[in-house]
Amino acid sequence: MFGFFKKNKTLPTFAPLVTDMHCHLLPLVDDGSKSLEESLEVMEAMHEVGYEQIRLTPHFSYPRYQNDEDNILERYKNFCSEVEANRGDRKLPRMTSITGEYQIDDGFQAHVDSGKLLTYHFSDPKQGAEKGLLLVEFSLRQKRMGMDEAIFARTMEGYDVILAHPERYPYFNSHSQFLEQLKEQGVYFQVNILSLDGFYGPESQKKAFDYIENGWVDFLGSDMHNVGYAMALRHASTNKKIIKLMEKNEFLNAKLAIN
């Protein structure tokens, strides 16, 4: 279906990460993949740039994507079976599990109260302990009151928090005091690889590099959605600045590999 992928140059630049911990390839549950075939083609492209494993992270965002954890788990189970039945001779990354990307919004607390949050588990080499990690995001349009309190409350409930793509929020700058305070609270940051290649524009690109330079970034994610994103990721794999960054920095993605 998308055979033009094969014509484009690619490098296994992201092999050191082992695992992509942020992608939207469960079909028809959010703004990500629209079909099994699209997911298969995108997964094949992700394998080509070095990923051995991927973690699906569907949106939980009120009112746009009112997903239910039980339904998502059932869809994921069926999707895994469909992938195995239709992969043919494709080389694909292994799917390790499924995690939610939860927006801090009016529906967030209901997911917390349900006791069914879909989280990561990994061993933090800095602290020598296994942690449960909750992936959260903020609105891309405007800052919401109480965002820091919502994150602090989760830590008090025993969760550690990963903030998705802080570089994409227009209300934070390269030296945001708010983000610095979150780091002091122990919040992990995940930057989008495509931000580093300018996919979302120059402002997000600059902040992505600045946050890494600040020592704030713990994870890199593809935030993969569709074929267009896959083409952009292939382009990013040949970006010399990104290749150098991958050689210079060590991220925690691989610590999710055994889960």
Give the predicted meaning of each segment.
Residues N173-E180, Y200-F209, V227-K240:
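Histidine/acidic-residue-rich catalytic or RNA/ligand-binding cores of hydrolases
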Residues L92-R94, R234-N259:
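Mid-to-C-terminal alpha-helical segments outside catalytic/metal-binding sites
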Residues T19-C23, I54-L56, T96-I98, I104-D106, ...:
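Hydrophobic faces of well-ordered beta-strands that scaffold small-molecule active sites
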Residues M1-M95:
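An N-terminally biased module of ancient metal coordination in phosphate/nucleic-acid-related enzymes
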Residues H59, V217-A232:
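Short acidic/histidine-rich active-site segments
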Residues H47, T155, I212-E213:
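Non-catalytic positions within long, well-ordered alpha-helices that form the structural scaffold/packing
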Residues Q66-Q185:
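Extended substrate/RNA-proximal surfaces in nucleic-acid metabolism proteins
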Residues G186-G198:
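His/Asp/Glu-enriched short active-site or ligand-binding loop at hydrolase and phosphoryl-transfer sites
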